[in-house]
Amino acid sequence: MRIIKLTVLALCLGVSVVWADDRPIYKDKNAPIEDRVEDLLRRMTLREKVGQLQQRCTWDINNIGGTYNGESFGTAHEMNISAQQAADLYQKIHEYKANETRLGIPILTSAEGIHGILQNGCTIFPQAIAQGSTWNPDLICQMTEAEAAEARVMGIRQVLSPVLDIARELRWGRVEETFGEDPYLISEMGIGFVRGFQKNGVGCMPKHFVAHGTPTGGLNSAFVAGGERELRNLYMYPFARVIKEADPVAVMSCYSAYDGIPVTGSSYFM
C-alpha cells in the first residue's frame, strides 16, 4: 500500500513538473522581464511582430471579433464614446486578446492627453501653449495627476503626450499644442507633465522626435532644415531632459524628414 501511495505521489509530482516546464516563460509574472520578452519574441511570427506596431479601433463592443479577427495588435485608441462605454469596451478587448489570440498578448490602451483626456465627458484643461505661460511645472504636474485619475477609470494606460516640439514656425497649425518656443521652458513643463501622469500609473509618450514642429512653410509633416547645431542645441534638448529626468515609457518619432533624412526610417536618429 505504501509503495502504491509513493508511486501515485511521484506521478503527481511528475505531472506538476511537466506542467511547470510547459508554461511559457513570458506568462510567468515572477520571471525576469528580459527573459519574458526574449521568450515572447522567439515565439512570435513576423506578422505578429508587425501587428504590435499597429493600432486597431472598433468602437463596437459587439463586433470585437470582426475587427481583430483573432490577430494581435499593439494599441487601441477608442474615441467619441462615454467613459463608461470606453471602460466596458476596453475590458472586452482585453478579454478577447487574452482568450482569442494565439499568444494572448495584452493590448495597450491609449488616448490623447495634451490638455485633458480626449474622450467624451472628460475634464478640459487649457491648451499646452497656455500651460507653458504659467511657468509652473508643479501646477502642470497636478493637472496631469487629475488627468491620470480620469484615464485609469476608463482603462486607459498611456497618453500620446506631451508635445515637446519647439514653436519656431508660427505658421504651423499645431503651435497651440506646444509649451512655447524656448527649449528650457519646454523641458521644465514636459518633466512636470510626465511625472504627474506616470506616478499615477499612466505612461507618457512625448512627441514628435525630432524637430517636427518647425516644418517648411508651416505645413504639418513637411521637411525640416536646420543642421547639426540646431538639432542638438534646440530640438533634441527637451527630449534629452525629459527622458533623463522623468523617464517616460515611450517616445513617438516624428513623421517628417530632417535635412532630407526621413527620421523614422533613419538608424542615426532612432
Positions of predicted regions on the chain:
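Hydrophobic h-region of N-terminal signal peptides that target proteins for export
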Residues: A10-W19
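Glycoside hydrolase catalytic-domain context in secreted enzymes
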Residues: W19-M270
